[in-house]
């Protein structure tokens, strides 16, 4: 089969995508496919228009890749691709809107305040919540632009930093606990969750360095959480995946609170990292699936969409 891999891109997650793309291309070649690699840039739209392939594997992360725009273009060109479609991609990228769907699906979310750059006035802003809080851009991944603020001064600095990345930002309650993630796999109506992965960062936070630098985080499979919480996050992950209209695969992140209360969903990743240190491949290993087998499974499921 002739498969094009889109990777790289122009988002803040470009370096991650370059690594994901390399892994995806090597796996596809190992599985016997003819592979065309495209380090994608918006100026290369003509390359997609003229593309003659059986399938596109999207290895992009962040904006202009994970937000539904590339998926929309491929739909217009009638080119099949791996993974979630336009609507599910766009919703998952928009954290504030996605949380509305999660709540409707009965999944616990963090309390939040949403700010917009066009109405925000630093001099008039008055936060009445409890510290610490998490400040983050609405449409960035890999913890880019994220700050944990414990004082008003840190909050104002965090707001300024988040606004550098997005016109809409979230201020969420900070929940102390164990961060876990659940890989979801399957066509619509046939989804299943893979083993829960516990994330143990070497840094204080599971930040960009912890996520992508070798040795900066430990992934424990299965996660060291209670059977009750394991069942909760596995079921909630599938419900969240379905609520947003995701397809084929996604990865859903949670915090399991130290106080024993229900886990809190953080986000759904429709194009999770596929680097050597990524979480989804580790979850797949938990069910005996090699990296190459996982990539081929994505291809097989996408051809049945």
UniProtKB/Swiss-Prot annotation:
<dbReference type="GO" id="GO:0005524">
    <property type="term" value="F:ATP binding"/>
</dbReference>
<keyword id="KW-0436">Ligase</keyword>
<protein>
    <recommendedName>
        <fullName>D-alanine--D-alanine ligase</fullName>
        <ecNumber>6.3.2.4</ecNumber>
    </recommendedName>
</protein>
<dbReference type="GO" id="GO:0046872">
    <property type="term" value="F:metal ion binding"/>
</dbReference>
<dbReference type="GO" id="GO:0071555">
    <property type="term" value="P:cell wall organization"/>
</dbReference>
<dbReference type="GO" id="GO:0008360">
    <property type="term" value="P:regulation of cell shape"/>
</dbReference>
<keyword id="KW-0573">Peptidoglycan synthesis</keyword>
<keyword id="KW-0547">Nucleotide-binding</keyword>
<dbReference type="InterPro" id="IPR016185">
    <property type="entry name" value="PreATP-grasp_dom_sf"/>
</dbReference>
<keyword id="KW-0961">Cell wall biogenesis/degradation</keyword>
<dbReference type="InterPro" id="IPR011095">
    <property type="entry name" value="Dala_Dala_lig_C"/>
</dbReference>
<dbReference type="InterPro" id="IPR011761">
    <property type="entry name" value="ATP-grasp"/>
</dbReference>
<feature type="binding site">
    <location>
        <begin position="126"/>
        <end position="181"/>
    </location>
    <ligand>
        <name>ATP</name>
    </ligand>
</feature>
<dbReference type="InterPro" id="IPR000291">
    <property type="entry name" value="D-Ala_lig_Van_CS"/>
</dbReference>
<dbReference type="InterPro" id="IPR011127">
    <property type="entry name" value="Dala_Dala_lig_N"/>
</dbReference>
<dbReference type="InterPro" id="IPR013815">
    <property type="entry name" value="ATP_grasp_subdomain_1"/>
</dbReference>
<comment type="similarity">
    <text>Belongs to the D-alanine--D-alanine ligase family.</text>
</comment>
<feature type="domain" description="ATP-grasp">
    <location>
        <begin position="99"/>
        <end position="300"/>
    </location>
</feature>
<keyword id="KW-0133">Cell shape</keyword>
<dbReference type="GO" id="GO:0008716">
    <property type="term" value="F:D-alanine-D-alanine ligase activity"/>
</dbReference>
<comment type="pathway">
    <text>Cell wall biogenesis; peptidoglycan biosynthesis.</text>
</comment>
<dbReference type="GO" id="GO:0005737">
    <property type="term" value="C:cytoplasm"/>
</dbReference>
<dbReference type="InterPro" id="IPR005905">
    <property type="entry name" value="D_ala_D_ala"/>
</dbReference>
<keyword id="KW-0963">Cytoplasm</keyword>
<dbReference type="Pfam" id="PF07478">
    <property type="entry name" value="Dala_Dala_lig_C"/>
</dbReference>
<keyword id="KW-0067">ATP-binding</keyword>
<dbReference type="Pfam" id="PF01820">
    <property type="entry name" value="Dala_Dala_lig_N"/>
</dbReference>
<dbReference type="GO" id="GO:0009252">
    <property type="term" value="P:peptidoglycan biosynthetic process"/>
</dbReference>
<comment type="function">
    <text>Cell wall formation.</text>
</comment>
């Amino acid at each position: 089969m002739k498969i094009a891999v889109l990777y790289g891109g122009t988002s803040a997650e470009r370096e991650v995508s370059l690594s994901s793309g390399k892994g995806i291309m090597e796996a596809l070649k190992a599985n016997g496919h003819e592979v065309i690699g495209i380090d994608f840039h918006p100026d290369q739209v003509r390359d997609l228009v003229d593309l003659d392939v059986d399938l596109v594997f999207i290895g992009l992360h962040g904006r202009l890749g994970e937000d539904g725009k590339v998926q929309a273009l491929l739909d217009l060109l009638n080119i099949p691709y791996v993974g979630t479609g336009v609507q599910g991609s766009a919703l998952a990228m928009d954290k504030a809107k996605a949380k509305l769907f999660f709540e409707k699906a009965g999944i616990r979310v963090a309390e939040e305040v949403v700010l917009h750059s066009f109405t925000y006035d630093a001099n008039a802003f008055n936060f009445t919540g409890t510290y610490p809080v998490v400040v983050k851009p609405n449409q960035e991944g890999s913890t880019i632009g994220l700050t944990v603020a414990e004082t008003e001064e840190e909050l104002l600095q965090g707001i300024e930093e988040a606004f550098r990345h997005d016109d809409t930002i979230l201020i969420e309650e900070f929940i102390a606990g164990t961060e876990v993630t659940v890989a979801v796999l399957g066509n619509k109506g046939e989804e299943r969750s893979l083993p829960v992965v516990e994330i143990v960062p070497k840094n204080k936070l599971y930040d960009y360095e912890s996520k992508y630098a070798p040795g900066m985080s430990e992934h424990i499979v299965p996660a060291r959480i209670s059977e009750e919480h394991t069942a909760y996050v596995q079921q909630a992950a599938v419900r969240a995946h379905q609520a947003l209209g995701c397809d084929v695969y996604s990865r859903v992140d949670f915090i399991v609170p130290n106080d024993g209360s229900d886990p809190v969903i953080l986000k759904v990743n429709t194009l999770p990292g596929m680097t050597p240190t990524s979480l989804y491949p580790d979850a797949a290993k938990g069910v005996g699936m090699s990296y190459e087998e996982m990539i081929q499974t994505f291809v097989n499921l996408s051809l049945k969409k």
